[in-house]
Amino acid sequence: MTKKQFTKDIIKLDDVDKTCNKIINKLKSDVYSLLGRKGGIVGISGGIDSSVSLALAVKALGSENVIGIMLPEKDSSPDSKEFALKLANKFGVRTIEENITATLEGFGCYKRRDEAMSRVFPEYNPLDFKSKISIKQNVLMQNMPSVFSLTIIDKNGLEKSKILPIREYLQIVAASNFKQRSRMSMLYYHAEANHYAVIGTPNKHEVEQGFFVKYGDGGADVMPIGDLYKNQVYELAEYLEVPKEIIERTPTTDTYSAEQTQEEFFYQLPFHLLDLLWYGWENGYQPDEVGKALDLSAEQVKHAYQTFERKNKTTEYLRMSPIRDYK
C-alpha cells in the first residue's frame, strides 16, 4: 500500500465526529461490559488531556456516573483548581478534592527532593526559592542523551541553573514521583469505593515517549486518548466544547514549585512539530521528505528521529507488565 504524501495536515483527523464516537462507544463498552464497573473516576487538573478524558467519559457513561477528583499539593498551581472546577461545571460532574500534601510529607517527598537540591545549590531553601528541573537541549540541532538542569528562582525572580549530577537527578525524580503515585492511589480508592473504573489521561506522546510515572499517572483501567497525538486531543477538545480557557492554556507539568511547560521539562519541541516529526518517524517517512514539508533540513529531522528512537527504547520498561516467566 502506497503511503500518503507527507504534509503538515497528515495527522489532522479526517472525521472528528467519527473518531469521537468510536472512542465513546468503546469506552462505554470497556467500562460497563469488559470491566464490569458502574462509572468512571477521572483525575482532573485543568489541563487539556484530563479535560478531554473527562468529556469523553461523560459522553460515554453519563455525567451522573463520572466523578472528577482534584488532587492538589503545596506545589500545585492555584489555577489548576480553578480550571478543574470550570471543567466539572461545564460537564455537570461531581467533584471531590483530596489535598495530598500531608501524604507526601509522610513519604518524605519534599524532604528527599530538597536534600538533593541543596547538594547542588547549598543556599537552596524551599521557603525562599522556587525550583524546577528541565532539559535545555535543542532536539533539532544535536543528537545526544537528555541532560537535565536544576533551576532555582529567588523571591526577586533571579534565576540560577546548574547541570544536575546523576545522583541528585535520580533522587529528585524519585521523590517527585511520589506525587503521581499518591494520586493514583487516591483515584483507586474512590474507584473501588464506588465500583468505578479509573479513566487514565495520558496521550500518545506521554505513553510512547515515557512521559509518565509507572504505577502513577500510568496506572489506569482505560486510556481513551492514549493513541491520540496532542493536536488530535485539541481537535477533540474543540469538538467536545471543552472550555476555551483550558484549550488556550499552555500545558504544564504542575510538579515543581516554579512554573514549567511540558516542552521545557521533557519534549524539547513545540507540539505542532513534535506530532508531525513523531508521525514521520513511526511511519517510516524519509527525513528529506518530512523536512521539506516542515521547512527543516534532513539533518534536523534525523536528529529528532534519533531522539525519538532513544526515548522509546530507554522507556520501554515503563510500558512493560511485570515479568512472570521464571519457570
Protein language model features and the residues they cover:
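Acidic, Mg2+-coordinating phosphoryl-transfer loop and its flanking beta/alpha structural elements
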Residues: 72
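Conserved G/P- and acidic residue-centered "switch" motifs that form tight phosphate/ATP-binding loops
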Residues: 47
